[in-house]
């Protein structure tokens, strides 16, 4: 029976939220796509996470998608609906939270955007990342959706006129309506917020990133089951489709310490047919040989593409598809390494190649 329905705006978000419950031992299912027929789960599933792929949609379309999913969950009488947001507050935050509130039919949505374990906290109404306001952080320079405001209410009001109210640490939500934005700087703060919501029986409509999601298993009293660890090969192939500076630095550090690194050129990663050709086959042969001889090998896209094209979303999808096709060829050719995929789009590209829609 589904106790919790999570709506994420991208695949990375769906996974980093789903893992909060899977690691606890709750039966968790992550589904890609918003076709309602695909959202049914077996009787053992406690947590259903859907990747709605709304991060890069126009705000109105994101609103409609979230509204429809929340209505589905209400009709199924699921006890808790969680609108997962990006921990840096990128994406259609205002449109999606207002849609969730409207579809729910209640008067309050409780939003806890902090993720203290990643040094992302909300203080005085401002969202801080690594100690600086969000718009001044690395996410203010995001090539796809830069964060342009640091005050949470300003971010919400970019896309909605729904009422917002800020709840400071230790403050009361009494008499407040709309999207309630909670201050949280520590895991203890988040646990206290969860306890307050439980005491008031207001756990039906929540929002936040994977940080607040981590307190939900206890809050919702999800049952725990034993999980066996997966056996891993001692060799590692890191496949990086992310353009996050931290990910790129990790690839550079691995190379500096002796790991063979294979980087795609802009032309290769943006081509629709290069991954299926002979030149790609030669490179993949070299990757396979390196994987059989070295403990760590890196295959990456070489960072952002300068002046790649007007349609950045199409470029992003094509790059993910190229990496997915390359990785499938490696697996088909007998790759015997543990694969670390960096970037949700990259993993989604592989899943498309394998015709897999859920995990």
Label every model-predicted segment.
Residues 129-283:
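Conserved, well-structured core segments that form the ligand-binding/active-site neighborhood
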Residues 33-37, 56-72, 319-322:
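Glycine-rich, highly charged phosphate/nucleotide-binding loops
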Residues 287-345:
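C-terminal structural cap/anchor segments
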Residues 44-60:
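Short, structured active-site "lid" loops
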Residues 24-47, 281-295:
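N-terminal short beta-loop-beta anion/metal-coordinating cradle
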Residues 7, 49-51, 83-84, 110-115, ...:
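Short beta-strand segments
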Residues 342-359:
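Conserved, well-ordered active-site substructure
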Residues 1-5, 27-31, 46, 62, ...:
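Cap/lid and interdomain-hinge subdomains that line or gate substrate/regulatory clefts
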């Amino acid at each position: 029976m589904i106790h919790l329905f999570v709506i994420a705006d991208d695949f990375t978000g769906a996974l980093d939220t789903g893992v909060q419950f899977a690691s606890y031992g709750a039966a968790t299912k992550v589904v890609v796509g918003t076709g309602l027929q695909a959202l049914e789960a077996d009787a053992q599933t406690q947590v259903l996470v859907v990747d709605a792929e709304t991060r890069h949609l126009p705000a109105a379309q994101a609103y409609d998608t979230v509204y429809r999913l929340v209505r589905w969950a209400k009709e199924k009488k699921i006890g808790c609906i969680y609108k997962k947001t990006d921990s840096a507050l990128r994406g259609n935050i205002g449109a999606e939270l207002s849609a969730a509130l409207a579809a729910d039919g209640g008067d309050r949505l409780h939003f806890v955007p902090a993720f203290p374990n990643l040094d992302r906290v909300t203080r005085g109404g401002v969202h801080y990342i690594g100690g600086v306001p969000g718009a001044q952080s690395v996410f203010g320079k995001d090539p796809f959706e830069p964060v342009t405001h640091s005050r949470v209410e300003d971010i919400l009001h970019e896309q909605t006129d729904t009422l917002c109210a800020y709840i400071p640490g230790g403050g009361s939500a009494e008499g407040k309506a709309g999207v309630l934005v909670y201050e949280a700087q520590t895991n203890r703060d988040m646990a206290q917020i969860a306890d307050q919501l439980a005491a008031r029986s207001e756990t039906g409509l929540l929002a936040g990133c994977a940080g607040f999601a981590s307190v939900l298993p206890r809050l919702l009293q999800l049952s725990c089951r034993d999980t066996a660890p997966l056996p891993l090969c001692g060799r590692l192939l890191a496949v990086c489709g992310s353009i996050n500076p931290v990910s790129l630095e990790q690839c550079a550090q691995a190379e500096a310490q002796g790991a063979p690194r294979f980087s795609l050129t802009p032309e290769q990663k943006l081509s629709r047919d290069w991954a299926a050709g002979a030149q790609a086959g030669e490179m993949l042969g070299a990757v396979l040989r390196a994987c059989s001889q070295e403990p760590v090998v890196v295959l990456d896209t070489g960072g952002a593409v300068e002046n790649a094209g007007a349609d950045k979303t199409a470029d992003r999808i094509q790059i993910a598809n190229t990496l997915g096709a390359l990785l499938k060829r490696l697996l088909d050719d007998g790759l015997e390494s543990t694969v670390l995929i960096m970037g949700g789009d990259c993993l989604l590209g592989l899943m498309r190649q394998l015709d897999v829609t859920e995990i």
